[in-house]
């Protein structure tokens, strides 16, 4: 298997559709082979799924909002805004998310959502600074968006330059934040999954800090490199 990085994607917004499909087709049980690690807000995913399996008529929005309020505490309002932004970004871009190939796993995150999402998460971290548990949960969710930004760092940077947008990201800052989030989570789990998490952390933190460049073919030697 390749290194599995979690999505910056709140999957619980689609759980009710899945449960309804099961009910409509008389499915009364199913088996989940692998949770693929504790992905972005997987605790909330499990909470919403469990309650809907017990009673499919429950209001999905109330379940999600109640879970977000309890899970993120003082940062709940900002985290709800962030999670809804990620949901809306995927729906807006109408892009299929693939399981393999790390670049394609983050193809639904665009520059605008990366910038706005980071601004919202800055506010969430500030709101949670007096609550250690909530702050660490914000950090753990944020590392999903940070992974997307690191994977597409130079692509986004070039786009920002072309569109005249201020470039707000610093690669070292993001790498340090990712490393801290993984270390906090390993402390919380008592080291469970250490090898996998360290592999993901090392992979992200080893991404090149300069863009990979190639020689321009002689046929294009009179072209501006920025246009190629």
Segments (PLM) and residue ranges:
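Catalytic domains of carbohydrate-active enzymes that cleave complex glycans
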Residues: 25, 52-228
